[in-house]
């Protein structure tokens, strides 16, 4: 186990290139299962979740070559369709094995996935969509067993716009016979990445970026070279970090086309940033003051499926709100346990009222003091790290494995921006 030792009170700024999006990298890596030809993926982040997925592929017989942030994957055949639970326990995204396995190999046997504990995360939408295509689900001793002799396209309406369910159904349907229509599909940037990658392999997916996808099945997919998009969660975290510490920051290759609503929400907290076709710019002088709603009412910030404000930035918004003047209600609609890290911010001196599992009221600006904190999940962990940089004195962030599941080379990248941080082995 490792910890970060952080000295707060220093400006963080400079120049950094955005890492690849973890939530794009994982499904795109697993989409390589759908062809027996070489798949080359660029801009893959070097993070723990990617390592686990690559270990799964190696364990079933895939050939993998990694050079820096590029991957070459070839899945000529596999040696088994049963996935070791030691892998699936570590990562929620292991659920994305279902679609490609049942599509190309006709079956899969795996344990229920692990990962972040931020609330109940249903699997029913996955099973509904895959069963509409012809897969049969067998619940065997707490394991997921799916079998399909043949997949046939179907029309379906998802009861929730689940990202991973949409991705599983897409991967299962690209090689299915006939047409598939997915209504109420997720349309996040990472879903768009997966669709664009599959189309570059010869798939026929229409409606990319919308909530209605039409997939015309093809007989075979070819290899491809595809570049993963930027991690807008990392970019959002860096915007907050620079703004709250008074730094001036340029984030290169940030895919700013995804930041329209994110910029609007940040502006409500007195944080403004600019962007051009590729880069994001954070200036060193920020207002850091809550903008009240009409009539002087306390503003509410809430999340939802894309293009609404992304749930993965809600933890970042909470810590940001502790450092701006004014009061804001933060309403997490999607996960009932994401808010349960705020006790750690309160321990540092934040003024936060936890109303219920979905809502907190944050009043700033609160001076924070360094403390010993443990990362409960990847996004809350980054929020605590931001709090440590803002706080007076020294903090220790424990269980950094959680942060490194989603953020690449955290300590070194922040050191290059002027941060005082070091990674040490925990006592």
From Swiss-Prot:
GO biological processes: cell division; cell wall organization; peptidoglycan biosynthetic process; regulation of cell shape; UDP-N-acetylgalactosamine biosynthetic process
Record key words, sorted: Cell cycle, Cell division, Cell shape, Cell wall biogenesis/degradation, Cytoplasm, Peptidoglycan synthesis, Transferase
Catalytic site: 116 (proton donor)
Annotated phosphoenolpyruvate binding sites: 22-23
Catalytic activity of the protein: phosphoenolpyruvate + UDP-N-acetyl-alpha-D-glucosamine = UDP-N-acetyl-3-O-(1-carboxyvinyl)-alpha-D-glucosamine + phosphate
Pathway involvement of the protein, from the record: Cell wall biogenesis; peptidoglycan biosynthesis
Subcellular location: Cytoplasm
Main location: cytoplasm
PANTHER family reported for this sequence: UDP-N-ACETYLGLUCOSAMINE 1-CARBOXYVINYLTRANSFERASE
Name used for this protein in its record: UDP-N-acetylglucosamine 1-carboxyvinyltransferase
Organism, as annotated: Borrelia garinii subsp. bavariensis (strain ATCC BAA-2496 / DSM 23469 / PBi)
